[in-house]
Amino acid sequence: INPKKDKLDFLVNLTNDAWFGKSSGPYQHFTATRFRAVEQGLPAFRSANTGISGIIDPYGRVINKINLDVSGAIFSPLPKKIKETYYSKVGDLLFFGVIIITLLIMFFIKKKKKYE
């Protein structure tokens, strides 16, 4: 995602979910789009050829959707974006920080046991 978030108004997810069939895949993809909307504080529009299409607000709420294997169109005003989120500021640094701290703790525990 573009680091200059102030220039973004919404996220778009165009996808081909046909190869998933009626499995859980399209539902997982739709849920992932909801997470991206919440992470970035931006509304998301998802259009899938046979999967689930919909409009999601920045809080992850589904405004409107078209179910699996249903043709249709959605007309809805653009939900407003919200203030920059913590995740949109730091991204995956938090995740990598937790990994590094965990590895350091494991290293020191192992080193301490070695000298006991």
Please give the residue ranges for each predicted region:
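Solvent-exposed soluble domains appended to multi-pass membrane proteins
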Residues: 1-116
